[in-house]
Amino acid sequence: MDKADRDAVIEHATQVKRLVHDPHSFLTELVAQQQQYHCIAWLCHFNILSNIPQPPESIAYSDVATKAQVPLSKLQSVARMAMTTGLLSETKDGKLSHNTLSAQFITNVHMKTQLLHIVNQTVPLMTGLIQATWKWGETSATNETAYNIIHGTELSFFEHLKTRPDLNEGFQAYMKSRAVSHTGSNVEHLLNAFDWKALGQAQVVDIGGSSGSTSIMLATAFPLLNLVIEDLPEPIENAKARLSELPSDIKSRIEIMAYDFFTPQPVKNADVYLLRTILHDWPDADAIKIIQGIVAAMGPSSRLLIMDMVLPKPGSGSVTFEAALRQKDLTMIQCFNAQEREVEEWKALLTKADPRLKIQAIERPAGSELSVIEAMLDESPEQAAWF
């Protein structure tokens, strides 16, 4: 079954379930979902999945309990609850085994990385949002978040990661994994969201470009593009290492520059300034500063491309797709006091940064969770915006 068919089946099932729920069945499912999550987290914490042989082999519960050093009775209860999600299975003779789904979280390193990050880092933040709201109320401070509550720190998310190499390693692995494996956020969607060929020979500035995945992809696909990767010193060193392994015809068109996007943009009059999954990490006040730094460097024909989520209006489309986007919106709140934005919020953000900045187009490629917002400077403020 391909992704489109799978998504359609899941959506229809979700809609049917919503229609037939009553308060009792709703609460029963709600509690079960919480238990299911915590059981999967327990399995990950004690490395249970790695102690189960690959299909079609199976193993006695007692043997897994001994290997993982966990109580047998707890292992049985936890594993059997996890099975109600479709993860793992039990043979007719009462042994524990992987099924097709659970085996992929062992054999596929990207799926394993994402599972571990979600259960260890993402979901625990949900419990901190109540405490953060009670403590700080209406705040946009990046160090007054659910993340601060859960980790007991006064540092912002990225500053705290600098002090915790273990968390930083997991976060970086998760981001790289999503970029290459998660169909909704795969960097390749950028290729189809904008007419790069129409630029001809052009300069593209990849702001916050990290280790260079986006720039390398663009340089490989479009031989007339020259790229500049901008980021802080540490990720820039990673980009240098990656570029050293590339063919000369690609790396010769990629420049690397240490840069803090809260400072003036050093590259003037570039054809494209690209912000890919950057602005959703920042509250409006900080996002405006980032955009203003770019606007000051833009020429009359420069384009600002923002690749980020554009939230749908509530109930305007697929429930499951909307839920997937809104859980990421909440993660932005919990980590940064930032947000994913709707079209009108993007329009307002750009206008606050500079009234001349007008949206020309918004494109979400098929299968992508992210949209590409194209904006240019318009010296005629009275002219209507794209939408």
UniProtKB/Swiss-Prot annotation:
Induction: Expression is repressed under acidic conditions, while the expression is induced under alkaline conditions. Expression is induced in presence of sodium nitrate, and repressed by glutamine.
Pathway assigned to this chain's UniProt record: Polyketide biosynthesis
Pfam families in UniProt: Methyltransf_2
Keyword match S-adenosyl-L-methionine: yes
Biological-process GO terms, alphabetical: methylation; secondary metabolite biosynthetic process
Binding, S-adenosyl-L-methionine: D231
Domain of life from the UniProt record: Eukaryota
Gene Ontology MF: a single term: O-methyltransferase activity
Positions of the catalytic residues: H280 (proton acceptor)
Function (record text): O-methyltransferase; part of the gene cluster that mediates the biosynthesis of fusarubins, highly pigmented naphthoquinones responsible for the coloration of the fruiting bodies. The non-reducing polyketide synthase FSR1 is responsible for the condensation of seven acetyl-CoA units to yield a haptaketide. After rings A and B are formed by aldol-type cyclization, the PKS-derived product is released as 6-O-demethylfusarubinaldehyde.
Protein name according to UniProt: O-methyltransferase fsr2
